[in-house]
A protein has these predicted regions:
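Glycine- and other small-residue-rich loops at beta-strand/loop junctions that grip anionic moieties
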Residues: 1, 94, 108
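Small/polar glycine-rich anion-binding or flexible loop at a beta-alpha turn
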Residues: 53-60, 96-104
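A short linear hydrophobic-aromatic micro-motif
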Residues: 46-50, 89-95
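A common structural junction motif
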Residues: 82-92, 123-131
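PLP-dependent enzyme catalytic core of the Aspartate aminotransferase-like
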Residues: 97-137
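Active-site C-terminal subdomain of aminotransferase-like
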Residues: 1-39, 52
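Surface-exposed helix-capping loop/turn segments at secondary-structure junctions
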Residues: 19-20, 43-49, 131-136
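Conserved PLP-binding catalytic core of the aspartate aminotransferase-like
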Residues: 34, 47-84
Length: 137
């Protein structure tokens, strides 16, 4: 590997140590995921892809839209993702190709909780915008 890659690795380890190590990283992941789990609890049109609490990820949180008005879930999820990307607030947020249509939000320890908190109103806006288009047709 190049010396830049080695230096980047050393810098990352130093940063990790400075915030409290592994337990701090796990705590950051838990806090980030909790923001999304709370959002899900507050909105009946979205749910966690995993219905089992013991299999939910705290790093790659996957959401599905469960509103009955959505006739084409894949198209709807694509449109929500496109809206978010067009506004510059979320990139590469679409669920994996082989997963059910929805959103995939990275909540790893390098993500700031305030950024996850800032994303939630945008997801609500994109959802409501797309639903309003369904209602108008």
């Amino acid at each position: 590997p190049s010396m830049l890659a080695v230096e980047d690795y050393l810098f990352s380890l130093s940063w990790l140590r400075s915030i409290g190590g592994l337990s701090a990283m796990i705590n950051r992941c838990d806090k980030n995921a909790k923001v999304i789990f709370n959002f899900i609890d507050e909105h009946d049109w979205v749910s966690n892809l995993s219905s089992r609490l013991d299999t939910r990820s705290n790093t790659s949180v996957c959401l599905v839209f469960n509103d009955r008005r959505i006739e084409n879930p894949n198209e709807f999820a694509n449109n929500v993702c496109f809206r978010l990307e067009s506004e510059g607030v979320a990139f590469d947020i679409k669920s994996y190709r082989d997963a059910p249509p929805g959103l995939r939000i990275w909540c790893g320890g390098t993500v700031e909780t305030r950024d996850v908190e800032s994303l939630m109103p945008w997801i609500k806006w994109a959802f409501e915008s797309e639903i309003s288009l369904l209602n108008s047709s």
